[in-house]
């Protein structure tokens, strides 16, 4: 990713957090966090990584709500960030948080099984 793509991604991350928390009224979108935004080098596609508090069903519902609001979100981004063309937005779950939690759980299990001397 180029330096410009990184800057656009960081700005989009900030704006998306604001748009999702303040502008979207869809009840399917619960407690949601934008963890990362990766913009392609040509600034045409933005992959938005999200984390949702809750089970798999809540995650799927949040993704459906975001897909429904994608056009509105893209137009809001276009009005807030000066770009020739607003990137196409793709939402994906950020699996790294679940992976990190799983690793932490395994480490705690190993420590609890370790015999004390």
From Swiss-Prot:
Q: How does it assemble?
A: Monomer. Binds 30S ribosomal subunits, but not 50S ribosomal subunits or 70S ribosomes.
InterPro entries membership: KH_dom-like_a/b, RbfA, RbfA_dom_sf, Ribosome-bd_factorA_CS
Lineage of the source organism? Bacteria, Bacillati, Bacillota, Bacilli, Bacillales
Q: Which organism is it from?
A: Bacillus subtilis (strain 168)
Q: What is this protein called?
A: Ribosome-binding factor A
| Alphabetical keyword list | Cytoplasm, Ribosome biogenesis
Q: Which family does it belong to?
A: Belongs to the RbfA family.
Identify the GO cellular component terms for this protein: cytosol
Where does this one sit in the cell? Cytoplasm
One biological process GO term for this chain? ribosome biogenesis
The chain's disulfide connectivity reads none
Report the principal subcellular site: cytoplasm
Please, which domain of life does this record's source organism belong to? Answer: Bacteria
Q: Name one Pfam family in it.
A: RBFA
| Protein purpose | One of several proteins that assist in the late maturation steps of the functional core of the 30S ribosomal subunit. Associates with free 30S ribosomal subunits (but not with 30S subunits that are part of 70S ribosomes or polysomes). Required for efficient processing of 16S rRNA. May interact with the 5'-terminal helix region of 16S rRNA.
Q: Name one GO molecular function term.
A: ribosomal small subunit binding
């Amino acid at each position: 990713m180029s330096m410009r793509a990184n800057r656009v991604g960081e700005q989009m991350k900030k704006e998306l957090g604001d748009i999702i928390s303040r502008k979207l009224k869809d009840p399917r979108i619960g407690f949601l966090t934008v963890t990362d935004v990766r913009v392609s080098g040509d600034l045409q596609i933005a992959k938005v990584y999200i984390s949702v508090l809750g089970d798999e069903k809540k995650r799927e519902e949040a993704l459906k709500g975001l897909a429904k609001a994608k056009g509105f979100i893209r137009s809001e981004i276009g009005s807030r960030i000066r770009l020739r063309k607003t990137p196409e937005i793709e939402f994906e779950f950020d699996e790294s948080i679940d992976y990190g939690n799983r690793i932490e759980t395994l480490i705690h299990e190993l420590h609890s099984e370790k015999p004390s001397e």
